[in-house]
Amino acid sequence: MIQMQSTLDVACNSGARRVQCIKVLGGSHRRYAGIGDIIKVSVKEAIPRGKAKKGDVYSAVVVRTKKGVRRPDGSVIRFDRNAAVLLNANNAPIGTRIFGPVTRELRNEQFMKIVSLAPEVL
């Protein structure tokens, strides 16, 4: 469950390390975002020669949450940290690598590029 002011790790090699959610997209008063949802983020911490610079605003898709995601069989997949992948204007990932596991739910949300780049799909 990501809301405004939540900080997330970045799970791609776009150059950003930490981002802060500044808006949850998808409805005028939508409060929370879960795995597979798109949010607007501001880069709070970045590596020196990366594509993303501190202060830049990007769209991002949430790939891991502490709240987790519930499957139809009743199981819940949770993670230790919240993480997102930065997207460009066409909703394609900016980075060329994805770090850490992602969930199968991203496949339903048309983020096949992220699923194919991820080292592990849960």
UniProtKB/Swiss-Prot annotation:
Keywords: Ribonucleoprotein, Ribosomal protein, RNA-binding, rRNA-binding. GO terms for cellular component: cytosolic large ribosomal subunit. Belongs to the universal ribosomal protein uL14 family. GO terms for molecular function: large ribosomal subunit rRNA binding; structural constituent of ribosome. Binds to 23S rRNA. Forms part of two intersubunit bridges in the 70S ribosome. It comes from the Bacteria. The gene is rplN. SMART domains: Ribosomal_L14. GO terms for biological process: translation. InterPro entries: Ribosomal_uL14, Ribosomal_uL14_bac-type, Ribosomal_uL14_CS, Ribosomal_uL14_sf. Part of the 50S ribosomal subunit. Forms a cluster with proteins L3 and L19. In the 70S ribosome, L14 and L19 interact and together make contacts with the 16S rRNA in bridges B5 and B8. This is Large ribosomal subunit protein uL14.
